[in-house]
Each structure stands twice: as C-alpha cells, then as structure tokens.
Amino acid sequence: MMDAPVSTPPQRVVSLVPSVTESLFELGVGDRVIGITDYCVHPAEQVARLPRIGGTKNPDVEQIIALRPDLVIANQEENREADVVALQAAGLPVWVTFPKTVREAFNLLWNIMYVFDEPSMVERIRSTEWLCDWLERMEQPECKVFVPIWSDPLMTFNADTFAHDVLRVCGGTNVFADRERLYPLAADLGQAEPLSADDPRAVGRDTRYPRVTLAEVEAAQPDVILLPSEPFAFNASHIPVFAALDIPAARNQNIRLVDGSLLTWHGTRLARALNTLPNLLCPSKSEV
C-alpha cells in the first residue's frame, strides 16, 4: 500500500473505492469528495448529489481529469492499473490503497487522518481498534466457516484476503484458508492435473479465490455458512443447496444470509462488522 502522493491536505477528492467513499464521509471529510463511482452507495443521502464517474473497473478517465481533483483514491484490487496509469499520466496524484488485513485497514484509516489533517477522526478510529483488540484477546471455541463469494462456479477466498482476516478476528476459521485457485478451471474442480507454478500459463495469476465443489464443502464440515449479498447476491433461494449437505451448519440451521460489505469493505464499516459477525459465528459465546 503506497503512501498518499500529496504534501498538503487534499480539498478536491475523487474516490474510486466504495468503502473509502463511505469512510471519508463518516470521518468528517465528505465535503471534500467531488466524484465517486457508480458503486459508491454509502452514505446514501450524501452520495446521491455527487457526480458519478463510471464503475470501479471502467471509470471515465476524461471525466475525472475534468473534475480537477487534487487527489484520486484507488485500490489495487478493485481498480485497473491501466486507469491509474492514465490518471497519473494526466498529472493527477493517485493514492493506491490495498489493505489485506484488519490491521492494515486500521493503518489506512490512520493514514487518511494524517493526509486530510483531521484529528477529529481519532475517537472514531480508536474505538473500533479497541473493539478489535478485545475480540482478538478473547478465548473462542473453533467455529469453522464457509463463505462463498460466487454461485456458478462456486467460489470462495483463502487466507491471503481481507475477508479471511475479518472472519479470523470475529472468531471464525475459514475452512478454505489453505486452498489456492488452480489452473485451468478443470484442475480447480479436481477434473484435471493443475499447471505447475512455473508454467507461463499460471505465472502471475491470482490464486486467492479458488473455485470449489459442494463435495469439498461437505468434506470441510463447516459449522456455519455465511451467504453474502456481494459480490454475488446470495438470497434465501440459495439456502436449500447447502442445507442438503451432511454438515454441522445444515444440521444446526446455521446457514445465514449476511451483508457482504461486512466481510469485504475495509474502512469505517469495520465497526459494523466487528459488532455483527461474532454473533453470527458464535451465538452461544456472545450470549454468555
């Protein structure tokens, strides 16, 4: 995660990251935001009045340039390198963020405070950090969790992701923490031999989001299954697919729909995640 390429507090900001957009408003500097993506939906009332510059993967670079921002905030995973390069070539400072753990997300929030020179953020950030510290110190029984992020093909995430670390802090053990995505697709589904790590067709590929089978889910024996609303919009109609498996989550009716942003949005939404997810993962513990 690179440092912000500005020497004075920015006054005209374009955010290409939905979670950062929300954080800027909740930390008191939303009045400096002059452009956002189509996926920046929170806080709803405040963002409704702002210019939209396209999607996270297909922003209108010329429109961003025309807005004359003194800082563009992007994310290494959510935005395309080609768009970042184009904005930089036009002379715009671009801050590329990429928190992959909860602690790195807190570091980003502190960096936002320093970059925007807004000390009023301290109490908000520190209170969420204290909650995280408390959760990490708790002795928690193992709670094996499966979280799909796509339906067809069925996909999940491994330990090298922000969502995995959110689960960890909240008391969950990701059942596919050690599973890497294999290439080609047939190999990921156990139907062919995978390419070797040094094969040119596999080098540089993202291995953090493996495709898995229902048989693998059954073998992993999760205690809880969380069906998130994003990136794939799981709903009640998907519950029977997993309820039919011979797993503790099905037997104990612990297959739950969840707001996907609690797992994947870094930033101030962490406060909601840390207050909500532990109760979904270990309800008996939270009631003690």
Model-derived features: where do they sit?
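N-terminal ligand-binding lobe of clamshell/alpha-beta domains
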Residues: 1-288
